[in-house]
Amino acid sequence: MSAKFEISFSKSVKLNGGLAILLKTAEADSAAGAETADPAGVIAKAAKIARFSAKSMATLDIVAPEGAPVERIVVVGIGKVGELTAHDWLKAGGAAASKVKNTDKVAIFIDVPGLETDARAAADFALGMLLRAYSFDAYKTKKNDDEEKSAKSVKVTIVTADATGARKAFSESEAIAGGVNLARDLVNEPPNALGPVEFAARAKELENLGVEVEILTEKEMRRLGMGALLGVAQGSVRPPRLAVMQWKGGKAKDRPVAFVGKGVVFDTGGISIKPAAGMEDMKGDMGGAAAVTGLMHVLAARKAAVNAVGIIGLVENMPDGNAQRPGDIVTSMSGQTIEVINTDAEGRLVLCDALWYCSDRFKPQFMINLATLTGAIVVALGNVHAGLFSNDDQLSAQLTAAGLSTNEKLWRMPLGKDYDKLIDSKFADMKNTGGRQAGSITAAHFLKRFVQDTPWAHLDIAGTAMGSPQDEINQSWGSGFGVRLLDELVRANCESR
């Protein structure tokens, strides 16, 4: 359960107990709000003793002296003014949220002397608090003291000169936090609780925000000829689903932008079974579908002025007596045939039918797919960058810029004919793996054969969607990577107003 912050904005606040959090730059002599929260001047003395330099995200925790208007004071350093970025405001909010303990009210002063704080910065700070506050403990029957206290509501007042503007900007921050935390929830859920049917039901709940949601059953997918996706699903007793989400916030004549997610709710590898060690993490093999679902939540919640489609292919890859075998040949919705070399290269089989369906039905301006697709991308990029593959330089540049803006970083990887020929098959139109070399690239080339002439990008998020290092705004195993990135892409390039 996430900590419950009731966040409001005000030009001033009357302090009466609780916690005061003050921001400080490295250059400033005093912290924001020091004259209000610290009339006795204890911050300067404590900072000198602790050698607190206000470097970025450093914190100083002080028990307020008797007679002070608050019980505790926390100073959060935000570094040098000239080096402060938009993402640093999120990090500062996260650092502040980590210090909210044993209190039900917090006043936060963010208008640092010498630094003009705008409404967007204040809203980003609040977003950082909401993202840091997330935790997933739905299945714990016994909680420690901190977990019990996090369930209680905390009133947070952020003091800033442009309180009205911050309040307006924060409505979008709440939408973003809702989408990111939805994606985190989906990735963190245990696989016995979140099968294809259950995941589709969670997507269906977006209708409450105005999203149109269709759920295609196995029978309907078979009628459409989705033999690649259905081949992956045939080893599981849990039936597959394809969820189609539409947000119609743009002009009726405008073609939609489209996002497609891999939703393998649990991946054993199938007949080409994975090693036992770490297999439990394969509950997160639907991180792409989770990100697409979270994005659709954000677009609807903030009433984005765009037409957007989100499609997620939901299957479970299991090795029963009916499972797909290495050597099988399946026919995709496109009519192209695929030789299955490795049943653990299943995500691309799910995506190829979803991509073709999306392109054929919606004729989108562009398609972006997200998938925890290959271990090879983790070897290449670790968990700092996601891999970016694209047939369109403009779309690639826009995605890269959005990644830098949100700190959800992408690194463009190569495509080329010499790689594409590695997936040619002797027995079918193509095979589903090209061998050990260039594994993430040949996987991207496989997908590229199903996008037709649509501008397209493939994000391989295997290293960033789950198990990434924890930081100021993410303490969760499932990170929600991709939601903020794609929302920024839409906001910067696609909205009609």
Swiss-Prot record:
Pfam families attached to this UniProt entry: Peptidase_M17, Peptidase_M17_N
InterPro entries on file: Leucine_aapep/pepB, Macro_dom-like, Peptidase_M17_C, Peptidase_M17_leu_NH2_pept, Peptidase_M17_N
Keywords: Aminopeptidase, Cytoplasm, Hydrolase, Manganese, Metal-binding, Protease
Cofactors named for this entry: Mn(2+)
Major location category of this protein: cytoplasm
Example of a GO biological process term: proteolysis
Binding annotation for Mn(2+) 2: 262, 267, 285, 346
Location of the active site: 274, 348
Binding annotation for Mn(2+) 1: 267, 344, 346
Catalyzed reactions: Release of an N-terminal amino acid, Xaa-|-Yaa-, in which Xaa is preferably Leu, but may be other amino acids including Pro although not Arg or Lys, and Yaa may be Pro. Amino acid amides and methyl esters are also readily hydrolyzed, but rates on arylamides are exceedingly low; Release of an N-terminal amino acid, preferentially leucine, but not glutamic or aspartic acids
General function of this protein: Presumably involved in the processing and regular turnover of intracellular proteins. Catalyzes the removal of unsubstituted N-terminal amino acids from various peptides.
The protein's name: Probable cytosol aminopeptidase
